[in-house]
Amino acid sequence: MTLSISIFTEPRKADVEIIEIKGTGHPDTVCDNIAEEISKDYSRYCLDTFGFILPHMIDKIGVLGGLSNCEFGKGEIVKPITILLNGRLSKNLGDREIPVEQIAMSAIKNVLNRIFLLLNVDKYVIVQNNLHYSRGPGVVLVPDQNNERYDYYTPKAAQGVMHARKDALCNDTSVVVGYAPELIGERIARDLEAMLFSRQFKASYPFVGTDIKIMLVRTEKHISITCCIPFICVYTPSLEFYKIQKEALKNLITYFLQTSHPDLSFEVFLNTRDNYEKPDLYLTVIGGAIESGDEGLVGRGNRSNGVINVTAPMSIEAYSGKNPVHHVAKVYSFVAQKIAREIYAKSGFSAEVYLVSQMGRSIHDPWKIVIKIVGVLNPDLD
C-alpha cells in the first residue's frame, strides 16, 4: 500500500455546482435498485445457508421500455416492459442447488411493485433471463486442474470458494473516490428529492409519479432548478387540471426552497418540454417513462452517495449489484466516503479520498491511497 497526502491552503472553487438526481422511477435507478435487491437477497440466502457469500455479479441489469397510450383520466400499457436479467450468480455449492432464478425473479417483482404502485407486474413485465455461469478469463486448462477459478460460479466445496476466506482478493483494477463535505447544492437537491418522495407529499399529490428528475445549477447564491415530474393519467382528468397542478407544484417547490434557504435566490422550471397545443405532456400510466420506450442500465444513474455531481470528484464505477465481498466498486466506494467524512469531522478540512485497487491484491490492502486535504494539517491529528 502506498499512501500519498496532498495539502492545499486554497479551497476547491465552490462557487458553481451542477447536481443531478434521478428519482426512484427513472429507468436507470430502477435497474440500480433491481441489481442491488438481487445481490442483497442472494447474499442473505448464502449467509443463512452456507455462512458466507458465494461469487456473484449482477451489475449489468437493463430495462427496455414498453409502449403505453395515455389520455386524460385513463390509459393503458399496450406493449410490456422487458427486464434484461444479465449477470452471474453461483448456482450451487457442491450438490446443494441455489434457487437463483427464484431469488432474482422475486427481487425484480418486489422492486417494481414498490416503485410503480399501478403496474401489474405479472401482466406487463417480461423478464429475459440471461444469467450464466462462465468462469471468466484467466483459467488455463491443464491436467490436474488446481485453479480455484475453474469452478468459480459452480464451486464443488467451501474450501474452493475464495469468498469463504478472510483474504478476499480484488476483482478488478479500478479507482473510486469519496469526498466531504457535501456543498449546499447537494444538500438542497437531496432535501428537494426527499420532499417530493415523502409520504405527506404523496398523500397530497397522488397524481405525481416516481420518475422524477432534478437538475440543479448553483452559481454562487443563485440556484436554478429544472424538475421533470410525471403525472399519472388516471388521476389527471383534464388539460386544465394538468396546468393548474403543474403551476401549484412549481409554487410548492419554490416555497419549499425559499423558506429552507432564505439567503439564496431560486428559479424553478417544471416539465419544460410541455406543449399544450399538441398536446405533448409528461403524462403517464404508471408514473414513469419506463412504460413508453425509455431504456435503463445499471451505473448510468446516481452515484453511491445518491447524486450525480459533475462539479466534484466522481467515481464512474457502478456499485449496484456488485458483490459485497471483493468487488472494489462496492467496498471501496463506502470506505473512501467514510474516510473523507471522518477527516472532515475531526479536522474541519475538506477532503478527497481516492482508493486504487489492483486485481488479485487483497481487498484489505489498496494498491494506492491518495488523499487531498484543504487546510493546514495538524500533525497531532489521528
Q: How does the language model describe each region?
A:
Residues M1-I19, Y152-L169, R218-I223, C227-I229, ...:
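N-terminal, Lys/Arg- and Ser/Thr-rich interaction peptides
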Residues M1-I53:
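N-terminal, positively charged regions that mediate nucleic acid binding
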Residues I19-E20, I81-R88, T173, I225-T236, ...:
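Short, hydrophobic beta-strand segments
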Residues R44, D48-Y124:
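Glycine-rich, N-terminal phosphate-binding loop and its surrounding beta-alpha-beta segment
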Residues I108-L239, Q245, I253-L257, H261, ...:
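Glycine-rich, mobile lid/loop segments that gate access to catalytic sites or pores
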Residues N275-A289, M359-P379:
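Short glycine/threonine-rich loop-to-helix capping motif typified by GTGT followed
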Residues E277-A329:
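Long, contiguous, structured domain-core segments that constitute the functional module of a protein
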Residues E317-V353, I373-P379:
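C-terminal structural cap/anchor segments
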